[in-house]
Amino acid sequence: MLHRPRITPAVANARRAMLNTLPADLHNQLVLIALSGGRDSLAAMVIASWVIPRLNGRVGAVVVDHGLQENSARIADEVRIRAEQFALNPILIKRVSPSRVSAGPEASARIARYAAFYDALEETKAYAIILAHTLDDQAETVLLGLMRGSGPSSLRGMKAVSYTPEDCRYMNNKACNSVTAVYAHNTQRCSCDSTQRCSCDSRPYPPPPEPRNENRSYFPHPSCKCVEGSATRFTNADIDSRFGVFIRPFLDITRHETGKICEFYGLDYWNDPHNEDVRFSRVRIRHNVMPVLENEIGPGVKYALSRTAKLAQLDTEYLDHLSNELLDEIASKESDWSIRLPINTLQKTPVPIRLRVIRLAALQYFTVSLSFKHTRQIERLLCSSCDIKHVNLPRLITAQRVGNYIYMHTLRGKL
């Protein structure tokens, strides 16, 4: 009789985490695993190869070769072979060039990587991509956010499930709107976005997928048809189906556990040299900051940071939801290049909501992500006695007080 080893707690925890994150029935749709060859992504691959078929789904993989290592092409091919051994199909290898993006090395790699993910989603019409971020990654992300001083949003870290609109600004290296996606299923319409759970489904999001219309092109996302600088806001009516979903089922699984999973399955994983390069902020936090915190404060620091992220997500998502509703009510589009916001309403609005409305107006109408400084400057326009009357924003956008309104418009003219 063939003896099968008893699964370990790490394997059981990871299977349970993935089962709890995915819909109960995938309706034979494809889910891609983002594979790098590292322990986390290999652990996600083997767990997904067990979980997803049991949810009536198919498993494939996308391997992104950043070309930053001399042997990166060979590593990508080895990862493909390993994925084939676990019957993943299809397996896509996407070769990207992060150096072409004018940003820092970490941001450039991320932008190029997400562009490759979108290409893979479009090419395969996959339901989702699974990313193998762990609890350790979440803790590091929270610390990175605190370093940047970006307020409560820095504490919420990464979401277990996020939708294409959240990250579509990375598509084609150009900013796009944060748009609420509309889902149609179970004979009723259900508005779900990255800040809400599905109101007509008892399971955590994402909602159950529908069979895809193969005659339809799902990418680029409709929100990405925006032109930089135009005052065109895309709302629920612009999207009539579900698009790409990014799922992080391992946010409660530690890096130690993913190593144990690889050990259980006899998988040799690749250690990316960049994960040891202290030029990168995340690496310094991982190897220099976190060990000190664990030694000086206690071994539960990363768990506390992860728990903080979950609590912060609940608070910030609720505030974002209220802000979106208020923006829907008060914003008036004056032209293709101008909107206005009533000063009286903003003055009566609590500061946390007011600042969010200002930021959302700039982002959703002009695809401009405002800094805290610019947001505060626009807020000063609400004060009639203040000496400031207009604010110059990035990408030739201007905010100006005229009468009882704040006007935001682009200096590029009608687009």
Swiss-Prot record:
CDD domains for this protein: TilS_N
Keyword Ligase attributed: yes
Keywords: ATP-binding, Cytoplasm, Ligase, Nucleotide-binding, tRNA processing
Main subcellular location: cytoplasm
Residues the record lists as binding ATP: S36, G37, G38, R39, D40, S41
InterPro entries for the chain: Rossmann-like_a/b/a_fold, TilS/TtcA_N, tRNA_Ile_lys_synt, tRNA_Ile_lys_synt_N
EC numbers for this chain: 6.3.4.19
Disulfide bonds: none
Gene3D superfamilies per the UniProt record, alphabetical: 1.20.59.20, HUPs (3.40.50.620)
SUPFAM superfamilies on file: Adenine nucleotide alpha hydrolases-like, MesJ substrate recognition domain-like
Ribonucleoprotein in keyword set: no
GO biological-process terms attached to the record: tRNA modification
Localization (cell): Cytoplasm
GO CC annotations on file: cytoplasm
Pfam families: ATP_bind_3
Molecular function in Gene Ontology: ATP binding; tRNA(Ile)-lysidine synthase activity
Recorded catalytic activity of this chain's protein: cytidine(34) in tRNA(Ile2) + L-lysine + ATP = lysidine(34) in tRNA(Ile2) + AMP + diphosphate + H(+)
PANTHER family noted in UniProt: TRNA(ILE)-LYSIDINE SYNTHASE-RELATED
Role noted for this protein: Ligates lysine onto the cytidine present at position 34 of the AUA codon-specific tRNA(Ile) that contains the anticodon CAU, in an ATP-dependent manner. Cytidine is converted to lysidine, thus changing the amino acid specificity of the tRNA from methionine to isoleucine.
Family note: Belongs to the tRNA(Ile)-lysidine synthase family.
Domain commentary: The N-terminal region contains the highly conserved SGGXDS motif, predicted to be a P-loop motif involved in ATP binding.
Name under which the protein is recorded: tRNA(Ile)-lysidine synthase
Organism: Tropheryma whipplei (strain Twist) (Whipple's bacillus)
